[in-house]
């Protein structure tokens, strides 16, 4: 059975009948802040030990742990870790003791064994760092958002074209979420017909006291649509099979953080894809402390033959477990709990793409288009005059 047929059969088998109730231990422990979102799955190595050596550098964001969880579960070996702050290196090695501390980034890039460099630098530094990595002959995997300016994106596209290396992005709200990946398979099968609209609601908990200073500086974090919005635009492109889109509306605001006037705690945007599908995105930093996890992220997909709702991280006041998929179609109503049943196949596919120079996990054009849309939405957004910003 080929891979595509296997995925189709696997998704169809879960959709065909109600799944047995899953234990709470099947779900990842909820993180207080999305910055610490680092799912752990079951190991499914696609390479032998030592066959895919990687390095982790610039540990400015906690997503580096999620990136490395996914890669090591797929068989990658972390050979080096580097950050100017030795405390970050020590914390990283506590979870990944196999990683040896490098003296410098240059030492990492000079190692001919290293095939991939993973990073979670300050957002404004991710694009230039990636170009440096690619120029050294390595593939690059960065946390989102990969860029804060369109100029950085243009430079990265040029370096990818000249080097042939991969510049990939950790769009974790789909790639590292089982409900999100299950929906990917459902779209491939056409379960709800042609997709008309995708609505993404992406609230996050701010946890202000734990955030570094750069997180609140506009030139460094890029803006809320550039940051959290990049996840949502990537999902829209995937679920609608669109390869491009136009921004028709974008708004940003700072409603509750006057102590950080450059910060944006709310944003929304509307898009029309080149498939004529529509997208509405709402992103915010207003998850209340009473919620059991960092955000009640939801995705609503409207098709010509049904609807899909993803309750990714919690089912509020009903079930504090994760990865709930609700489907309505011509046959009825369905709830499918997919935690522990889908896995995180992107990482293994990505490793094989790096080795085989293929594009099974995701195309380079797709990764860059999601980033481009987030940058365009941010640039076109009307900034609301609020009491916090005035």
How would you label these PLM feature ranges?
Residues 62, 87, 318, 337-348:
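Active-site loop of classical SDR/Rossmann-like NAD(P)-dependent oxidoreductases
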Residues 170-178, 207-245, 261-266, 366-367:
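Mid-domain beta-loop-alpha active-site segment that forms a flexible
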